[in-house]
Amino acid sequence: AITDTVYRVRIVPDAAFSFRAGQYLMVVMDERDKRPFSMASTPDEKGFIELHIGASEINLYAKAVMDRILKDHQIVVDIPHGEAWLRDDEERPMILIAGGTGFSYARSILLTALARNPNRDITIYWGGREEQHLYDLCELEALSLKHPGLQVVPVVEQPEAGWRGRTGTVLTAVLQDHGTLAEHDIYI
């Protein structure tokens, strides 16, 4: 577990797989119950697929998946799905917008985009109700030190004393920073 409600799960597949950054997989609970989860790993990471699963008593949908993983130590997945994958245009500035475990989708796109073009201008806005919901913020800040074009904007709705990031909602922060988004590639 990364936090008391967020789990980093690495699936080691039995067979070869491929996907594009930004796509998701379906965890097969039974024939009629398939549950979508964004992949946090990149297509270049061939040994595993990483998921960030927010599982708690208020999210029984995801908790049932985590319970199965913890009990059986294996799951069946259907991969890949989704059309919101990273496009090949590597020149335009990029904005990534994520909330909570939605960061997994943004992480896959971010790491892939930086591998393709380490100097690309990328801004990632990551919001959470509380600072603890930004569970991989240290990883992002370390990446921003290696990539001068990467700007990390953490946003917390209910900040504690000493919070140094932005407050409010992610979309408010984006709109405060950008008059227009027309010249950016945007992934939400």
Regions found by a protein language model. Name each.
Residues 1-73, 128-130, 155-159:
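Ferredoxin-reductase
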